[in-house]
A protein has these predicted regions:
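Conserved C-terminal helix/tail region of periplasmic/extracytoplasmic solute-binding proteins
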Residues: 302-334
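N-terminal secretory signal peptides that target proteins for export/translocation
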Residues: 1-3
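Secondary-structure end/capping motifs
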Residues: 232-312
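Sec/Tat signal peptide C-region and signal peptidase I cleavage site
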Residues: 18-23
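Short, glycine-/small- and polar/acidic-enriched structural segments
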Residues: 24-163, 169-172, 188-194, 218
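Bacterial N-terminal signal peptides
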Residues: 5-17
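Pocket-lining segment of extracytoplasmic ligand-binding domains
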Residues: 88, 98, 176-267
Length: 334
């Protein structure tokens, strides 16, 4: 009789374990973004039918931020799993915010790659600013101190002998408001990223004073980053997520899907689809195959942060990279 009771207890325990495993919640993966189309997170959400593991091993939650510096706080507070950090905010997160466990896991986009788009820093076409030196005593707009566009602007102005506060004033404004800042003459120079840079209203009144590639050449502008403990704890779910992500990004980059890509772009921006014939073409930022980042370019880029005094020492980028998750996902799709 005691054997029967033991067998019954073992069966019940096994049943409980199976039930617990089956009822395990999918891993929540919150991914940051700033601009639609330019950032992958909102675009992934538009092609959920290609995400075979979505709702099973993980759930996706795109979260919008004003700029990459705010993502550092969210990462530190456990409010974000994947941050699309700029080269400028990566060393700040690692050194200043003390997140030594932060890892680069994938590419989001690169600027200045030969034959692809490079973002512009715009002035009024009929205004007085003809060269960088003309910005002395003027107002320059930025997203946030330490953001990628901010660092590129400061670097270019320094090359021409101009320093913040001493030679020009800097004001902060969200990217969608930059056209109005320029048009209303609240700023003399504004940074513009896609898709805002191709706004027809902007193009009618503005011209680029310089391009990002003029400052530093190829820029590993944005990378996906995550903290190592989260990656270690949720590796299987992350590989599933990476597999779905690569499947979707390949779909967007396929010229055969151009019409639907334009329709999606129009929907997420609430603008006419025909404005987005540039999206995911050579007129766009460069998106690396299988989202493999250019770590050599990134190493060069982060060195600017030390030069500008945002961090005290440079970091070894390769020691803060873990590309194995997306590598494993890419192998699944071959």
């Amino acid at each position: 009789m005691s054997c029967l009771k033991l067998l019954t207890s073992l069966c019940a325990a096994a049943s409980l374990c199976i039930g617990t495993a089956q009822s395990a919640e999918p891993v929540k993966i919150r991914v940051s973004w700033i601009a639609p189309i330019t950032n992958w997170a909102p675009m992934l959400a538009e092609k959920k039918e290609l995400a075979r593991h979505l709702g099973k091993s993980y759930v996706l939650e795109p979260v919008r931020y004003v700029g990459t510096p705010q993502m550092i706080t969210a990462l530190a507070n456990g409010e974000l799993e994947i941050a699309n950090l700029a080269f400028s905010t990566l060393p700040i997160a690692i050194q200043n915010a003390g997140m030594s466990d932060l890892k680069v896991i994938a590419d989001e986009l690169q600027d200045g790659v030969d034959g692809y788009y490079s973002q512009g820093y715009m002035v009024l076409a009929d205004g007085p600013i003809k060269k960088v030196e003309d910005l002395k005593g003027k107002v320059v707009a930025t997203v946030a101190a330490g953001a990628a566009v901010d660092v590129a602007m400061r670097t270019m102005l320094r090359k021409h002998g101009l320093e913040d506060k001493r030679d020009y004033a800097m004001v902060e404004a969200p990217l969608p408001t930059m056209r109005a800042m320029l048009a209303d003459k609240k700023a003399d120079l504004v940074p513009l990223v896609l898709p805002f840079a191709l706004d027809p209203e902007l193009r009618r009144i503005a011209r680029p004073l310089f391009l990002n590639r003029d400052v530093v050449g190829v820029t590993q502008l944005l990378t996906w980053t995550a903290r190592q403990p989260f990656l270690d704890k949720n590796r299987d779910a992350m590989v599933d997520f990476a597999e779905d992500t690569l499947r979707i990004t390949r779909w967007y980059l396929d010229p055969a899907n151009r019409s639907e890509v334009m329709a999606i772009s129009g929907r997420v921006t609430k603008q006419p689809p025909e404005r987005f014939d540039w999206a995911f073409t050579r007129r766009d930022y460069y998106h690396a195959p299988d989202m493999v980042p250019n770590l050599d370019a990134l190493q060069t880029n982060v060195a600017m942060m030390k030069d500008l005094g945002f961090v005290t020492t440079s970091i070894d980028v390769k020691k803060h990279a873990d590309l194995s998750i997306f590598e494993a996902a890419a192998k699944r799709l071959k």
